[in-house]
Amino acid sequence: MKATELREKSVEELNTELLNLLREQFNLRMQAASGQLQQTHVLKQLRRDVARVKTLLTEKAGA
């Protein structure tokens, strides 16, 4: 997910996106803990996507 795509979204859409990313991250962490996750790089990508969304939410709150 690109930051430019996220910048076009509203605060409500960003909050929804954040919730979805956190749910997906939780599910992938459970798969990794049980040894079922084959593509471990997805966890890193999700963590960075969460950080991007949180950063944009903070920027929009300050503006």
From Swiss-Prot:
One of its GO terms (cellular component) is cytosolic large ribosomal subunit. Coiled coil: none annotated. GO terms for biological process: translation. It holds the Pfam family Ribosomal_L29. Keywords: Ribonucleoprotein, Ribosomal protein. The keyword Ribonucleoprotein applies. CDD domains: Ribosomal_L29_HIP. GO terms for molecular function: structural constituent of ribosome. The keyword Ribonucleoprotein applies. PROSITE patterns: RIBOSOMAL_L29. Belongs to the universal ribosomal protein uL29 family. This is Large ribosomal subunit protein uL29. The lineage of its organism: Bacteria, Pseudomonadati, Pseudomonadota, Gammaproteobacteria, Enterobacterales.
